[in-house]
């Protein structure tokens, strides 16, 4: 029977409904269920009469258990899917089976002694002695790890205080077992048996804890080994662990088997019907379980709880199998691996060689496995911490090139990682710690050597492989971005090209520092870097002005581009390298850079640019930029008119101060073909350069008014000139050109007294025609609503009348367009006929054929009129 928990009512609670249990203050109630499932603060309990119901948890207090059964409670906590007790028992049994016969005999002797000692301690000793955990003196012989050569790792890791506690427990246990007891009665024997069970359970718990501690201690005997030792793990434990690690690859049958073992056999057919695999199982949620026809909320909650336990065990098994997989993994190089990077000998480094770490055949497959938990090896930056030991020779380290996984790049790159990389366990930096800390600007220069403690560019020889980029063009964190598609201006320098570089601390580079290998001493100058490092640097940008020679352009280059090598290092071809003897005689500019070096800066060409014809009189140079190329160098003072090739970039084009478009004008689409035809807008075309004093001579109406601005609603005073439907305004009478224009064609003129708009004054509101209206005409200004106010009512009346006349009056020079199809005649001809319009359609020949009475009456009247005129 499981443990029973009781509560005492702190406050009285009257049950308001049938499912609520009334509480009386001070009484004790049996607790059946807490709110683990719902979390609403309502518990379920039972009173002394057997009535069940729910009650608020805030009204009761949980008291100690009256009756407990440790075996049942422990059995209820274990999980069917991941039986940790089974793993522990199997590992314990296998470890005991490997022990010698003497160990087995000692275990039997220990069990007999424990039984007799428990009897004696219960009969003669106090009951509180049962709570003390009893550990035998020969407990070291129970574990195979203690039989290894040298001291036990468990005892080595334990402090002296813990060992003294074990000795005290051992002494108490021996004292208790030494005493003898008299024959007990049947009642006392029952108590002895129950107490004996509790003692055995306590000893079992201690053995399990010690076994787990010894297993974890023996798992990593060597700090330099990246993989855990698993030789001491039994076969059954390995099988369970491997099955848990293979959860994403479970089939539907394995998922159903797991459900049956987990006590969820009622929903197993639903999973089998929908073909739920292990990968889908790890991603299930409550909504998906509803789709699987699991209608009960309690059943869905239980399934989700089991799945969460499976996820936790899956992650725990991965950590136990590969405890350092989330950290930089150091793989020792094999003896047959070829590498062009030399290593420093052990005598030179002053340390002992690191032990080779054990490897498993399937570990590489596990690393390449597509999982979200396993990080990519290419994203791990492994580098010794140079700040931890300032006096250490910084040339002893060798930094190999990083490489992408083989699954992402078809090219297999030889990769090497330092062997002395430790784990991230310690917070304190060590000599082998791979943690790279950000150094302050004051720490950028070493105190002893005066050299920069961290260089800003990775160092590699031309024979080593450079940094790879995948097909999508993405690079690794901390490295300069380099696109593999669409990069039409990629530099292609030849190999083994010496490079001019002046060492210095960088200020803008985000690449992790890499020290220079000691093997490169003597082969190249101290300031030489490889061409792979320069390929990732952007070239310096140069902006030229009309009539400026390239030599003067070079003088305006920032000295940091050539002296620091941070973001614009210069690569020279063998032909362009200045002679060391002639270096002293070359002129030096104010920036400290010689003309020969500056001429080499201009020694670049774009592969896709067209050659431009030379102009002896001088050419017009626009915004030009430099791109590296293995072309020949220019002379020290190149002739005027040499057109520099361009390498356009978004950053350089955006920062160009030249070739700005004029305000109010837009370019045609045909400009991309080189026609350079500028099309003016309607406003810029309509504005005229007539002075205000000249415009008022031919104006229909002119004067000062206040116009409300469109953006902020501010009333600004302007001088307006109206001529026809063209309303222009000036800022003052001294303006030489119009400042604004309003086309009043087909506008409506109204008056408004809005307090918000005009502050209580009467304002003239000029409304444009609605889109699609019959009176809508072509206007050269945007159709906006305009508001005007005047100083007095007379001016307001004068301007409103002028606006009405301009909008109503029709231009007689423009023909009137109509949609009517009725034939019309001129006004002069209509006056001559003096007849009604219908008579124009009647011919003399058709007068006799008219049969209509109305037509006969009209004809008779016309005849009478003609006869009367003749008389």
UniProtKB/Swiss-Prot annotation:
Modified residues (Phosphotyrosine): 229
This protein's GO CC annotations: cell cortex of cell tip; cell division site; cell tip; cytosol; early endosome; medial cortex; membrane; recycling endosome
Main location: cytoplasm
BP-aspect Gene Ontology terms: endosome organization; exocytosis; receptor recycling; retrograde transport, endosome to Golgi
Membrane topology: Peripheral membrane protein
Domain SH3: 2-65
Record has Cytoplasm as a keyword: yes
Domain (PH) ranges: 698-808
Parts of the chain that traverse the membrane: none
Compositionally biased residues, Low complexity: 88-100, 109-124, 329-343, 456-467, 549-560
Keywords of this entry: Cytoplasm, Membrane, Phosphoprotein, SH3 domain
Positions bearing Phosphothreonine: 442
Gene Ontology molecular functions: lipid binding
InterPro entries in the record: Boi1/Boi2-like, PH-like_dom_sf, PH_domain, SAM, SAM/pointed_sf, SH3-like_dom_sf, SH3_domain
Positions with biased composition (Basic and acidic residues): 62-80
Cellular localization per UniProt: Cytoplasm; Membrane
Domain SAM: 250-313
Disordered: annotated span: 42-168, 329-371, 384-670
List of residues that carry Phosphoserine: 224-225, 241, 433, 439-440, 444, 549
Biased composition (Polar residues): 131-168, 384-395, 404-451, 492-511, 561-574, 583-606
Summary of the function given for this chain in its UniProt record: Has a role in cell elongation and separation.
Name by which UniProt lists this protein: Protein pob1
UniProt gene name: pob1
């Amino acid at each position: 029977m499981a443990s029973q928990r009781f509560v005492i009512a702190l406050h009285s609670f009257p049950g308001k409904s049938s499912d609520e249990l009334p509480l009386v203050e001070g009484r004790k109630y049996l607790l059946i269920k807490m709110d683990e499932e719902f979390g609403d603060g309502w518990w379920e309990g039972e009173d002394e009469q057997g009535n069940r119901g729910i009650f608020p948890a805030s009204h009761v207090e949980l008291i100690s258990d009256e009756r407990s059964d440790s075996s049942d409670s422990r059995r209820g906590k274990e999980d069917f899917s991941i039986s940790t007790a089974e793993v522990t028992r199997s590992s314990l049994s296998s470890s005991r089976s490997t022990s010698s016969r003497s160990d087995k005999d000692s275990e039997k002797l220990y069990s007999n002694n424990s039984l007799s000692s428990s009897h004696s301690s219960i009969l003669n000793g106090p009951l509180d002695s049962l709570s003390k955990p009893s550990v035998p003196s020969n407990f070291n012989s129970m574990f195979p790890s203690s039989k290894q050569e040298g001291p036990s790792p468990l005892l080595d890791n334990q402090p002296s205080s813990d060992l003294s506690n074990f000795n005290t427990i051992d002494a108490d246990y021996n004292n208790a077992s030494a005493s003898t007891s008299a024959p007990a009665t049947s009642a006392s024997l029952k108590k002895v048996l129950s107490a004996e069970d509790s003692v055995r359970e306590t000893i079992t718990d201690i053995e399990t804890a010690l076994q787990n501690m010894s297993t974890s201690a023996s798992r990593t005997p060597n700090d330099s080994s990246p993989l855990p030792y698993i030789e001491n793990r039994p076969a059954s434990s390995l099988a369970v662990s491997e099955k848990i690690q293979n959860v994403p690859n479970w089939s539907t049958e394995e998922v159903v088997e797991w459900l049956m073992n987990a006590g969820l056999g009622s929903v197993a057919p639903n999973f089998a019907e929908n073909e739920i695999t292990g990968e889908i199982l790890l991603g299930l949620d409550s909504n998906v379980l509803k789709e699987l026809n699991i209608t009960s909320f309690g059943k869905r909650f239980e399934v989700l709880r089991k799945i969460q336990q499976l996820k936790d065990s899956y992650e725990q098994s991965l950590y136990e199998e590969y405890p350092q997989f989330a950290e930089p993994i150091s793989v020792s190089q094999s003896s047959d691996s070829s590498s062009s990077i030399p290593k420093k000998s052990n005598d030179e480094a002053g340390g002992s060689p690191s032990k080779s770490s054990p490897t498993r055949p399937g570990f590489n497959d596990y690393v390449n496995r597509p999982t979200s938990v396993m990080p990519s090896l290419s994203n791990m930056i492994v580098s010794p911490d140079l700040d931890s030991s300032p006096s250490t020779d910084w040339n002893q380290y060798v930094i190999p090139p990083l490489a992408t996984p083989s699954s992402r790049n078809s090219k297999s790159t030889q990769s090497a990682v330092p062997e002395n990389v430790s784990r991230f366990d310690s917070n304190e930096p060590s000599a082998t710690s791979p943690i790279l800390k950000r150094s302050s600007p004051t720490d950028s220069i070493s105190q002893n050597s005066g050299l920069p403690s961290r260089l800003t560019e990775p160092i590699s020889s031309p024979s080593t492989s450079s940094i790879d980029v995948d097909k999508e063009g993405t690079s690794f964190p901390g490295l300069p971005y380099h696109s593999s598609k669409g990069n039409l201006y990629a530099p292609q320098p030849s190999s083994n090209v010496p490079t001019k570089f002046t060492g210095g601390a960088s200020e803008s580079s985000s690449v992790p520092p890499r020290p220079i290998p000691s093997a490169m001493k003597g082969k190249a100058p101290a300031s030489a870097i490889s061409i792979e490092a320069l390929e990732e640097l952007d070239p310096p940008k140069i902006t030229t002005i009309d009539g400026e020679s390239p030599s003067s352009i070079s003088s305006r280059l920032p000295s940091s581009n050539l002296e620091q090598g941070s973001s614009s290092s210069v690569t020279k071809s063998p032909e362009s390298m200045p002679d060391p003897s002639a270096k002293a005689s070359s002129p030096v500019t104010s920036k400290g850079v010689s003309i020969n070096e500056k001429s080499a800066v201009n020694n670049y060409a774009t592969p896709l640019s067209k050659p431009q014809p030379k102009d002896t009189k001088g050419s017009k140079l626009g915004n030009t930029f430099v791109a590296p190329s293995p072309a020949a160098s220019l002379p020290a003072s190149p002739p005027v008119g040499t057109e520099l090739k361009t390498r356009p970039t978004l950053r350089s084009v955006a920062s160009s101060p030249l070739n700005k478009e004029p305000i109010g004008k837009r370019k045609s689409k045909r400009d991309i073909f080189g026609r350079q035809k500028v099309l003016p807008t309607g406003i810029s075309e309509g504005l005229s350069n007539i002075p205000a004093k000249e415009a008022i001579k031919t104006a229909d109406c002119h004067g000062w008014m206040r116009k409300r601005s469109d953006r902020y609603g501010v009333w600004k005073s302007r001088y307006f000139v109206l001529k026809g439907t063209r309303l222009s305004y000036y800022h003052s009478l001294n303006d030489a050109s119009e400042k604004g224009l309003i086309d009043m064609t087909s506008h409506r003129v109204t008056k408004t007294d809005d307090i918000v708009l005009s502050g209580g004054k009467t304002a003239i509101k000029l409304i444009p025609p609605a889109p699609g209206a019959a009176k809508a005409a072509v206007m050269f200004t945007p159709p906006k609503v305009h508001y005007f106010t005047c100083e007095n009512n007379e001016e307001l009346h004068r301007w409103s009348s002028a606006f009405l006349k301009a909008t109503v009056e029709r231009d007689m020079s423009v023909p009137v367009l109509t949609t009517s199809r009725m034939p019309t005649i001129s006004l002069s001809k209509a006056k001559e006929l003096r007849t009604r319009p219908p008579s124009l359609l009647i011919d003399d020949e058709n007068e006799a054929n008219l049969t209509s009475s109305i037509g006969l009456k009209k004809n008779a009247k016309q005849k009478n009129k003609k006869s009367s005129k003749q008389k």
